[in-house]
Amino acid sequence: MMERFSRAVIRHRKAVVALFAALTLLSAACIGQVKVNGDFSDYLPPSTPSTVAINVMDDAFDSDVSNLRVYVQGIDLMQAKELSQTFAARSDVLASEWLGDNLDTSIPLETQNQDTLAKWRDAEGYLFQLTISASNTQEQIESIRADALDAAGATSCAVDGSAALNASIMDSVDKDMAIIMPLAVLVVLLVMAFATTSFLHPVIALAAIGAAIVMNIGSNIIQGEVSSVTQMVGAVLQLAVSMDYSIVLLTNYSHATREFTDPEEACVRAMTRSLPVVASSAAVTFFGFLSLTFMQFLIGRDMGIVLAKGIVLSFLSITLLMPCLLHMLRRPTAKLEHRPFLPSFSKFARACRAVAVPALVLAIAVAAPAFVAQDMTKFNYGSSKNIAETAQVKVDQQTIDGRFGEEQTWVIMVPQEQWGHENALVSKLEALPTTTSVTSYGTVAGSTTPLSLANESDVSALISGGYSRIVLASAIGEEDDTAYDLVEQVRNLCAEEYGDSYHLLGDTVSYYDIRDVATQDMVTVRVASLLAIALVLLIMFRSPSIPAILLFCIEVSIWINLSIPYFMDVSTSYIGFLVIDAVQLGAAVDYSIIFAHKYLRLRESDPGQTPAERARDAITGAAVPILTSSAILMLSTLGIYLFSSSPMVQELGMLICRGALIADLIIFTVMPTLFLLRDKLLGKMRGGGGRSDGASRVAGGWHAGGSGLRQHGKLAGASRAAGHGKLAKLSQRDGSPAKQHFIPKQFAQR
């Protein structure tokens, strides 16, 4: 069945390539239509209090609260008044406020409220607060800055606020991607050139995966928009995680070209042997990413869908498109062949075995402390942490905060015209030590003033849709313990007057709700990913002990990785914390499967080996595909860490890079010892012989999936010439005539 399918694909290779080319071009045309969202609060579950509050305010009021502060130096009062009119006249400015809206500028300012004056003016300039449309861009922010600098007398301008932060995030995504993706491509070309026997092999692999990446990004148009984090790391992670699929195919293709003189037959055999291996590996990674969709915080669903979809597209591209390209480009591939660059890993294997026992003891000793420590890590939840301190918007924020102090503006919506409760709440809010101002209908027009007699602009801004709006300004940071404590205080004060009939919203309020949701999501994602991958491994190996060994090694590596921020006493992005659970688990299980397959295959093909020899040879055989794939993942994510301008994305890159390194160390040092202990235990239970259920089936069913390129195909020629291999006839499991396979000496039966 599988062979007939593979043969049909190769026979219709031109149609397959044409189909992938058409889909890639169509997807490329859609990429520009995919919107990118940098506001994390938009991904809160619809039922959270802050999300409900935002929706209620959008329905009840035409205007939002201010989301931009503009500080202009060098202008006088009249010039500030003219600039306020310029801002108000802009079509993208929904509302504006300046000193003249709070004090009477026709009389000397020195005779008026000095606290109010200090809020809007200092010795060098004036502050303006604007409300602009949510779909703002960096170009829009720069246009507002240009208007300010064009004002007569203006010498400098600083712009901050949530709108400026979001625009800066979107701008940094595009700039970072222009650096990160070419760097990742270069990493793949260099690493694959070392791991293959032709300079064209990395290009073919990149073409296949590149098509999958373009199709994945373009197909995001179905979702309408993706988060800035997904946009930043999705393509690089898809490239890095799915590269081992191409390595498996190239391994089997190199082997098949030695085995069969007919190029078409070689491609068919390579496809047939690779499909089960790649499908199993892709399934593990797919479910690892899909576990993110169980998060209540919808950015998890966003990332999970995009990454899981990318794995499916990479699987299809590697198993269908890449064999066709290998066959069609076989002649130029042969002309660009080169000698093997990678050294023998026998010394590496001996070194791993030398430290195996101490490594196992250390892994067991640190497992519990690492598990506990990872849950004690401090997290950042706000999107402002996604901006580098050197970014213009952060520099401007520091300038404005230094002049006028940190300030967060929240909105409280309460039932309309319940003046007794509203006045009582306003009094309680004004009494808070962090409050800088409270604006309500009562403070602006007077609660005794009939709505019909009040200023129309005051009424429309503060009363609408059955709600009265209270604007609370507080001298707090965006995301710290003081801010979160204030959220609880204000909610309690509102509940005292209105019960559940109020709505509170603001950036910090959203981050508070994100924190609550994230705490639940951590457990959900871990359990979902663990159960999904455990089930796939159980089906694959049909033996509970092998998945248990694999998952223990990988989970310990994850616990160690995620506990490091706690021991370093640094805070980290909780999104990176959640993503690494799925990414490291999915990627590292691939490596574990390669080692497990190699070990089980050796045990079946050479039962005369001593356990120590088997473990050493398994490490030697699995080193090339594991280290090649992990090197691509580590170097690509290291590039993200070094070149991304987003601190949160940098943290994610470092977490994945460090996690892949830790996983490699545990796989090569701890896992072989656990397999040996498992064999000894089973041997004693069965009277000194036998193997677990499923071990034989797995070992026989995975042909060359993780044995590495040095042991097969053209790379094996060097070993064969040196007398390190021999041809052996292996009878097929179904009893059909034997075929000749090249078996390196260390793997051949003695």
Write out the residue ranges for each language-model feature.
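Membrane-embedded transmembrane helical bundles of large multi-pass transporters/channels
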Residues: 1-38, 136-379, 495-750
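Structured non-transmembrane domains adjacent to transmembrane bundles in polytopic membrane proteins
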Residues: 46-163, 376-546, 552-567, 571
